[in-house]
Amino acid sequence: MSEETLSFQAEVSKLLDIVVHSLYSDRKIFLRELISNASDACDKLRYEGLTQPALLEGDGAFRIRLSIDAEAGTLTIADNGIGMNRHELIENLGTIARSGTQAFAEALKAKSQAASGDVSLIGQFGVGFYSAFMVADKVEVVTRRAGEAQGWRWSSDGKGSFSVSEVEGAGRGAAITLHLREDARDFLDEHRLREIVKTYSDHIAIPVDYAGKEGEPERLNEASALWTRPRDQITDEQYAEFYHHVAHGFETPWHTLHYRAEGKLEYTALLFVPGQQPFDLFTQDRKPRVKLYVNRVFITDDCEELLPSYLRFVRGVVDSSDLPLNVSREMLQDDPRLRKIKGGLTKRLIDDLAKRARDDESAYLTFWENFGAVLKEGIYEDFERKEDLVALARFRTTASDTPVSLETVIGRMKEGQSALYYITGDDATALARSPQVEGFVARGVEVLLLTDPIDEFWVSAVPKVGDTALKAVAQGSADLERLALIDGKQPPDDAEHAPAETAKMDALIAAMKAALGTAVADVRVSARLTDSPVCLVAKEGAMSLHLQKLLRQANQGSELSGDRVLEINPRHALVKTLAERAATGGSVDEAALLLMDQARILEGEAPADAIAFARRLTEVMGKGLI
């Protein structure tokens, strides 16, 4: 087969351009990324070789070897792992076979424009191979997949295309040769390579050798599984570098959990909570990313049974001697031992989070900002640990821009307050100013501002926090009559409740119901409004307006007008004027429709009829009053 030239996927071309021209802050990470990929390739073959020994071809001693050619200006990183065939070469090195590629390119570009030129996103997005182009103006890969006879060569200068051709005599695995740029020739110095490997790859369980011109290859790393060492023999720096390896991140992990469980079921866990959000935190598969080993033999990095999905931000390894080496996907799904490991890991992680929250609330809030939206999924999904997870939750409120615990808010409840109140929406600042919370704020009642989509679901699973009911301010009745305003005075309501005034409001309500028809289930006087003329709320027990909106955005629902109630403020001057008009037989139809659209807009919706809304608004502006 002759050489074939192919074009990179569009997003890869953008990525390469950014890598080549912008990301120069810490170029030596390319070696860490390529060694990490080589280690993964060896792990995969070791696992496949358990059930298909012929794939090992009589060579089960896995290794990664570095070699340099000073005259040619090349650095080669070779492994005897799983290797790739033609299809895999094109799939893995010509495309980014993951969702969100455009988002990645944009995020990487934004990072590159920052003063630091942060390159941590490269590994996080599973494209560490492309970091080679930070130091090379040409990259060649010679590879042969285990169990196949044909070898292949992949070559590219990173400028939009790559070539693939057959090659004879290729060894199993992959050899990546970098033709180094003139300003990257320092990577031809063997002492520099030793330093980089010792710093970034000492924990790699596969031996990393340096092949000099004379003598036997020299071992550069310790090549022992870090998690098997006693904790007191591991430095913070070694933990951090191992985290960089398993998480493909550059930041310091926020938390490290390393322990050995003994007894009927034995396993070792080395887990990390990242210092920043992984890019794939909100992908649809919601899979945990912890590696499973059996007796230090890699089994899978795609084991959904190790952790619940709401802890999918955790990275690390779990190694057990009580699982069979030939464990299959089906066995993993049904293995009671794995369920026990999952329970143990989950409990330890939640306990550690609770301790960090007690010991250092400020540091815990950093974690919460990154992963709170995911952790709250567990409140809805994990009945057994629901109360523990509720205790870990932090929320902004109408009284606090800094997220606080529910225990704190309950401790600040007003005398006579019967429930813990919340409102859901897209933006905390907007929620704090929404009409539905006016009456609560006026009475000094603190309201939780819930802005994550998952909030709509977990609140349905938590009717009470301890002995305190949890209630939506935009649903059902307001229940504020027993609470005094902050200044200790109730509104001057004698006149408002006089028979004549009540009759006027009744006339207005009847007229507005007639004008709005089926757009609402009811129109009623509000106890929650103090400044705004109207607002929309959901009927008691009905789906919230915000959840209706989320479902419509996901094409899973429509406006449920039969569940909506329009509340009017009897103390507002505009409402009083309309009541006078309705009581004397005047029409309030146009005003009712205009106020309904105003309430819709405040809920983040469009008017029912934008053209009619604009016409009514123009007429009102022209008259100067209704």
Curated annotation (Swiss-Prot):
C: annotated segments: 550-626
Gene3D superfamilies: 3.30.230.80, 3.40.50.11260, Heat shock protein 90, C-terminal domain, Histidine kinase-like ATPase, C-terminal domain
Signal peptide: none
Residue span of region A: 1-329
Matches recorded under InterPro entries: HATPase_C_sf (IPR036890), HSP90_C (IPR037196), Hsp90_fam (IPR001404), Hsp90_N (IPR020575), Ribosomal_Su5_D2-typ_SF (IPR020568)
Subunit note: Homodimer.
Protein name: Chaperone protein HtpG
Originating organism: Rhodospirillum rubrum (strain ATCC 11170 / ATH 1.1.1 / DSM 467 / LMG 4362 / NCIMB 8255 / S1)
